[in-house]
Amino acid sequence: MARFRGSITKVSRRLGIALSPKAEKYLERRPYAPGEHGQSRRGKVSEYALQLREKQKMKYLYGVLEKQFRIYYKKAVAQRGVTGDNLVKMLERRFDNVVYRCGFSPSRAGARQLVTHGHMLVNGKKVNIPSFLVSPGDQIEFRQKSRNLDAVADSLNKAAESRIPEWIQVDKANRKAVFLAIPEREAVQEPFNEQLVVELYSK
């Protein structure tokens, strides 16, 4: 599937959230939108603009393009429960996101590369599809020849224990993890309001 090829830093500044470690550093120095008038943009923001911005946040955070994001939304509507909660849970189950949550990569983009380049296994089988949905009890690990990648070791060394969520159990020494459970919405600490996205698609 095609991926966003533009400047993640500019998008991060426009949305006001860090989409990568590099963007986080830029936001600390320039916490305003890019462009000549970035610091002076004021005025009332329309309801539609707010809803659209929240959708953009979710899409860019999880690295999902519009077509697939809409598919996730339709599936969330069809499921029992709260649509917004269902949407977030599906995004959290994406394989590239789970690899990121494990601390195997400092960013979701990096985690996606690990997956697409064939470095990762699920229950002992190679899975190179970032959108693959991980289920409770699934075991995630590196292929034997990929376990000592320098980038992975560096990421694990920097990953604070507090960053690894409670629904994932990680064995850093052996480059393995277990997806224990699908997280409840309140446990997912991300800077977006999915209810505004539901309102946008419900129009």
UniProtKB/Swiss-Prot annotation:
The Gene Ontology biological process annotation of the record reads: ribosomal small subunit biogenesis; translation
Question: InterPro entries from the xrefs?
Answer: Ribosomal_uS4, Ribosomal_uS4_bac-type, Ribosomal_uS4_N, S4_RNA-bd, S4_RNA-bd_sf
Q: Read off the Gene3D superfamilies from this record.
A: Ribosomal Protein S4 Delta 41, Chain A, domain 1, RNA-binding S4 domain
Superkingdom classification of source: Bacteria
Q: Where is the S4 RNA-binding domain?
A: 93-154
Statement: the UniProt record of this protein carries the keyword Nucleotide-binding = no
Q: Which UniProt keywords apply?
A: Ribonucleoprotein, Ribosomal protein, RNA-binding, rRNA-binding
Which SMART domains has this protein been placed in? Answer: Ribosomal_S4, S4
The terms describing its cellular component in GO are: small ribosomal subunit
Record's family? Belongs to the universal ribosomal protein uS4 family.
Self-association state and partner proteins as the record states: Part of the 30S ribosomal subunit. Contacts protein S5. The interaction surface between S4 and S5 is involved in control of translational fidelity.
What is the official name of this protein in its record?
Small ribosomal subunit protein uS4
Q: Whose protein is this, by species?
A: Chlorobaculum parvum (strain DSM 263 / NCIMB 8327)
